[in-house]
Design a protein with these regions (language model features):
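A charged helix-plus-loop insertion that forms the helical arch/lid used to bind
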Residues: 70-81, 124
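A non-catalytic, amphipathic alpha-helix used as a structural packing/dimerization or gating element
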Residues: 86, 90, 132, 136, ...
Length: 314
C-alpha cells in the first residue's frame, strides 16, 4: 500500500486474495493515519478470522518508511551490537504500536566498496563484523515482538546497480559469495523469522543464471539446506524491470521454495494471484509446495500471536 487502502483493495482482502500488505513510499508521515490504515485492512481480513501480515521497510537512514519511528540511524552508523540492538528494539516498539508485525530488515548484505550501490544500508564490508551486528538487530526486533527479515539473500553487497531498475548479475566466484553468507547465517541463528530473496542472478551459485528468487539451488538447496533456514522466504518485489523478461514468475518462485510473493503495485499483484491459481490447478507439485508454505506461514502467525501480534477477536 502506498497510502490508505482503496475500496477495491479491501474487497480483495475480504475475498482472501491477499496474505499480507507492505507499506511503501512516503505516504506514512502521520502515525495516526498509518494506524488507521492498518486497522482497516485488518478489519477486512478478520471477517475470515485470520489477520494479515503487515510489513514495512524500516531499516533506518534513507530507507525508513515511517519517519516518526526508529531507527533514525542508518545501518552503517550502528557500529556496536548494543547500538544495533537498541535501535531495532526502539523500532519494534513503534511498529507494534502501529499494528505492524514484520520489519523487512536488517540488510545482511556485505558491501563491497567502492562501487556497491547500497551505501549506508549495509552494516559494513567485513563479513565477520557485519554478522554480529545483523544478529543484534534481529534480537532487538524479535525481543519486541516484531518479526525480522534478513535480506537480500544470497547478498547484494557487490551489486553496482539496483535490481529495482534493471536485471543484475553478480559475477563473483563461489568462494567470494559463500564467505559473505555469514551475516545471513547469523540472522538465522539469531531467530530471524523471514529471509528475503534477491532478484539478481548468481551464476557461481546457479549456473543457469536464474534470478535467486526463482532458483531452487539457491532458495531450497543453499538457504534451506546449507544454512538450515526453516522459516518464511519472501521475494523482493516481483513487478520490477529486473524480472520483466522472466516467464511464469509466481509458479516458478513457489517451486523454488518461496512462501510469500511480494508486489509493489496492485495490478501486477492481481495478475500474479491469477497466474498462481492457474498453476496450482494444473500442477500437483505446486499444490504441495503451497501446502508446505502454508505450514510455514501458520508458524509465523503463531509466533506473532505468542509475542503480542495481531489477532482477530471472535
Amino acid at each position: 500500500m502506498w497510502g490508505p487502502p482503496t475500496s477495491a483493495f479491501l474487497a480483495r482482502v475480504r475475498a482472501q486474495q491477499v496474505g499480507g500488505v507492505i507499506l511503501l513510499g512516503n505516504g506514512w508521515r502521520s502515525e495516526a493515519a498509518t494506524e488507521a490504515a492498518v486497522r482497516s485492512v485488518q478489519a477486512a481480513a478478520c471477517l475470515h478470522g485470520l489477520p494479515l501480515l503487515v510489513a514495512v521497510d524500516q531499516e533506518g537512514g534513507t530507507v525508513r518508511r515511517l519517519p516518526w519511528a526508529e531507527p533514525a540511524l542508518a545501518a552503517a552508523h550502528m557500529t556496536t551490537t548494543a547500538k544495533a540492538r537498541a535501535e531495532a528494539a526502539a523500532a519494534a516498539g513503534a511498529l507494534r504500536e502501529a499494528g505492524i508485525s514484520v520489519d523487512l530488515a536488517p540488510v545482511a548484505d556485505v558491501a563491497t566498496p567502492p562501487a556497491s550501490f547500497e551505501g549506508t544500508r549495509s552494516f559494513g564490508s567485513d563479513p565477520a563484523r557485519v554478522a554480529p551486528l545483523v544478529a543484534a538487530f534481529v534480537h532487538g526486533l524479535t525481543s519486541g515482538g516484531v518479526a525480522a527479515t534478513a535480506k537480500h539473500f544470497p547478498g547484494l553487497g557487490s551489486a553496482t546497480a539496483s535490481t529495482d531498475d534493471r536485471p543484475v548479475t553478480i559475477g563473483r566466484g563461489k568462494a567470494f559469495l559463500t564467505a559473505r553468507l555469514a551475516p545471513f547465517q547469523a540472522a538465522v541463528s539469531a531467530g530471524a523469522e523471514l529471509v528475503m530473496m534477491a532478484s539478481a542472478s548468481y551464476p557461481a551459485l546457479d549456473p543457469s543464471g536464474t534470478p535467486a528468487l526463482l532458483s531452487h539451488p539457491i532458495v531450497t538447496d543453499l538457504l534451506r539446506g546449507t544454512l538450515g533456514f526453516g522459516g518464511v522466504v519472501v521475494t523482493d518485489a516481483l513487478d520490477t524491470p529486473a524480472l520483466r523478461s522472466q516467464p511464469d514468475v509466481p509458479g516458478r518462485a513457489v517451486a523454488a521454495g518461496v512462501d510469500l510473493l511480494l508486489y509493489a503495485h496492485e495490478g501486477p499483484a492481481e495478475l500474479g494471484f491469477s497466474q498462481l491459481v492457474r498453476d496450482a490447478k494444473a500442477s500437483a507439485a505446486i499444490r504441495a509446495d503451497l501446502a508446505a508454505s502454508a505450514q510455514r506461514l501458520d508458524a509465523l502467525e503463531a509466533w506473532l500471536a505468542a509475542h503480542g501480534g495481531p489477532v482477530c477477536n471472535p
